[in-house]
Structures are given as C-alpha cells and as structure tokens.
Amino acid sequence: VGLPDNGIFKIGDTLTEGELIHFRGLPSFSPELFKYIENDDPMKSKQFYKGLEQLMDEGVAQLFVNQFNNRRIVGTVGQLQFEVIQYRLENEYNAKCRWEPVHLYKACWIESDDEKEYENFKKRKYQYMAKDSEGRDVFLADSGYVLSMAQQDFEHIKFHFTSEF
C-alpha cells in the first residue's frame, strides 16, 4: 500500500479503521558518539534545519538540543552516520554542515515521581541538560564519574539508557 506523506507519518506509525491500538514505539538507545552540528551556510538555514529534522525523523541519528548553550548535538552509534548526514544534507537538501567535537560519555533520559527533586536535579545539572527531538529531558553526562555521582546524589531520579520507559 502506498501512502503520500507530507511529513505527518513517522517510522512505527500504525493506521487502522478505528480500532484503538497502542504500541510503545521504537526505542532509541543512548548513542556512543556525539558531535555538535552547525549550519555552515547561513543563507541555507531553512534547508539545513528541514534536512536535519527529516534525517532525524528517519532514524539516521539522534538530535539533542543543549539547554545550556542551545547548540544541537547529534548522537550516533558509529562514525559513518556523521558522514551519511553530511552527505545527505549536501546532496538532498543543498545545505552544508560542519562538525565540532563534544566530549560526552552517555545520554540518559530521566524521570522521577518526586517533582521537587526532579526540578532540583535539572537546576543543579543545567549545563548537562538537553531535550531530545520529542521534547523529553535528557542528561548528557561527560564521564562515567559524573553519571555515577548524579545517580548517587539523586536517588529518586531514574536514569534510562533507552528512550522507551
């Protein structure tokens, strides 16, 4: 079956004739590699952001927006994905990007039943906080030690290494 898509469908969407079906969706795993991505041609900003959004929707990589400096961070499981993103942005969207290194250890989706501790955590760890493409809070630990200390200091915060929890 072919369906025209103007961007409303995502991988894993289900169509029915009225039945109420609920799937958990496809999980996103914590990436292994991280880099800042920057638009290399300000005259092509619209193409750059549209291409980046569509590539992330396809699941090529994961995009996080750092809450401290508002920079976009792409997370992947392999170096080749960065090259694929750059190639596709240039050849499919006529947009150029450049990569800048960022040292991160792990991306953890966080949640808590203790709203006060949750807000305190986000406030104290502001420089490590980001949002994923779905608007969920993500803690970007720059070392195993930082992650371990956060888990120890905030025992009511749950740290998840996949986005489905």
What positions do the PLM features span?
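Structural and coupling elements of P-loop NTPases
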Residues: 1-165
